[in-house]
C-alpha cells in the first residue's frame, strides 16, 4: 500500500476483530455461564473446556483462531511486507488480550496466535499446535503446553519461515507476558488442569 491510511485501517480492524472474544460469544449463544465469572475466569479455550466441555471449547477455539484471518487475507492481498502483516496480526492479539469492550478483560491469545500464524507462517502454526497438543495430553495443563509452544515458535520460524522470525518472536513475547500469572501458579503448584470441573450436587435430604 502506498498510503499509511489503509495500513492504519487494517491495524484498527485487526484490533476490533481481536476484541471479539470467542469464549464470551460462544457461551452466550449456547446459554452457558460466562467463563469470565467462573473457573480461572479467563475467556479462553482451556477455561471453557473445564467449565462446559469439548463442544463449546472447540467452537471457542475456532472463533478465536478464525477472527484474524479476514484482515490478514486483505493484508496479503495488498502484498504488504511481512513486518506489516505482523503488525496487523499483532493488533489482533492485542485486541484479544486487551479488548475494547468486556472491560478490557481479555484472554491469553494462544488460539488467536495460532490463527495469525496459520496466515503468516503456516508450518510454524502446525508445529506449535502439535507441540501444544502433545504437552497438553502429557501434562494435562494448558499453561505448560502454551508456554512451551510460545517458546518453540521463534525457533520453528527460524527453521521453517525465517523471514517471519522477528514477528513470530513478538507474538511469542506477548503470549508469555499474558501467562505471567500462570507461571507464578505453576511455581506454586496451583495451576488448574484441563479436566472438566465436576458440578457440585446439592445434598440429598
Swiss-Prot record:
Pathway: Lipid metabolism; phospholipid metabolism. GO terms for molecular function: acyl-phosphate glycerol-3-phosphate acyltransferase activity. Pfam families: G3P_acyltransf. Its main location: membrane. It is found in: Cell inner membrane. It is a multi-pass membrane protein. The chain crosses the membrane at residues 7-27, 54-74, 80-100, 116-136, 141-161, 163-183. This is Glycerol-3-phosphate acyltransferase.
Amino acid at each position: 500500500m502506498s498510503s499509511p491510511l489503509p495500513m492504519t485501517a487494517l491495524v484498527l480492524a485487526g484490533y476490533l476483530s481481536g476484541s471479539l472474544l470467542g469464549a464470551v460469544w460462544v457461551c452466550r449463544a449456547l446459554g452457558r455461564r460466562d467463563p469470565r465469572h467462573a473457573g480461572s475466569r479467563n475467556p479462553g479455550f482451556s477455561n471453557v473446556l473445564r467449565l462446559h466441555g469439548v463442544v463449546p471449547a472447540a467452537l471457542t477455539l475456532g472463533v478465536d483462531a478464525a477472527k484474524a484471518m479476514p484482515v490478514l487475507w486483505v493484508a496479503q492481498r495488498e502484498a504488504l511486507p511481512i513486518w506489516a502483516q505482523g503488525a496487523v496480526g499483532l493488533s489482533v492479539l492485542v485486541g484479544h488480550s486487551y479488548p475494547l469492550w468486556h472491560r478490557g478483560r481479555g484472554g491469553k491469545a494462544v488460539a488467536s496466535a495460532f490463527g495469525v500464524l496459520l496466515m503468516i507462517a503456516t508450518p510454524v502454526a502446525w508445529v506449535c499446535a502439535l507441540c501444544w497438543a502433545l504437552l497438553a495430553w502429557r501434562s494435562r495443563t494448558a499453561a505448560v503446553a502454551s508456554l512451551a509452544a510460545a517458546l518453540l515458535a521463534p525457533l520453528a520460524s527460524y527453521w521453517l519461515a525465517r523471514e517471519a522470525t522477528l514477528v513470530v518472536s513478538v507474538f511469542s513475547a506477548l503470549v508469555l507476558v499474558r501467562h505471567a500469572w500462570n507461571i507464578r501458579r505453576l511455581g506454586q503448584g496451583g495451576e488448574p488442569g484441563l479436566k472438566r470441573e465436576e458440578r457440585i450436587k446439592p445434598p440429598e435430604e
